[in-house]
Amino acid sequence: GQNVLRRRGNRLFWTRPERAVDAIDLRSAAGKGIDIIDVSTGRVIGGVDEAAADRTVHPGAVYLHQGDQWLVDEYNPVEHHALVHQDLPGYWTQPQSASTVRILREERRRACGPGYVACGQVELTEQVVGYLRRDEITNDVWDSVALEMPTHTMITQACWWVIPDKVVDDLKFDAVHLAGAAHGAEHTAIGLLPMYSPCDRWDVGGVSTVMLPDTGACTIVVHDGQAGGAGFAEAGFEKAEEWWHATIMRLAQCGCESGCPACVVSPKCGN
């Protein structure tokens, strides 16, 4: 579309005088990122991609760069910058978000245990709604700050497990405990996915719900973090039985009493 490639026979050749590699952002495939600017000097100290900006450089966020702490004074996604100043606030910030998922197209499905597993295209909606200020020594929550950030929608690929009502009834959980159990299983499954798919846990995300309208049942969704999909969730679908069995075994065999980083605690959860 920009006449940067020319076909000769069965090959494509770069036609511009600058190097092709200079047009590729190693930090993000999502286009122009957000520059992080020191307000005292005007110097760009770093950058984040747009997909992560609402969570990392929202107003009031503590941004860590090369061991230094910076407080975000202003975040302007239209101008693609965040203004920061250096500080030692004594706390770190944890973004809080609200997420929903809608199944657009189920492409494959098969039985998996008492329920079934499927994969296909989903629409994700996410909004950062606030953040916690947590003590940098004890991790205790100081307070919660509300934010009014824009809602973002992304269409990508996902794999989802549907747990039938009979299994839910046998557990005899109330809605709160059922939601917590599904959420914990989602975290564990995401943490174990790199065993079955060439990804990092930061390359994927998840949503779990007691009742997803599209399935009519308790559903755990693991999705690619890239718009359009990256093949990670689909690779998980191919190994769903092994993946789900490993998830259950990790939950059953972990020696902790109330959840730990080895099982249900996720470093990236903001729900």
Task: Outline where the language-model segments fall.
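A short, conserved structural fragment
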Residues: G1-R11
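Extended Lys/Arg-rich polyanion-binding regions
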Residues: P17-C254
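Generic hydrophobic alpha-helical membrane-span motif
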Residues: A185, C263-V265
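Iron-sulfur (Fe-S) cluster-binding segments and ferredoxin-like electron-carrier domains
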Residues: V265-N271
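Short cysteine clusters
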Residues: C254, G259-C263
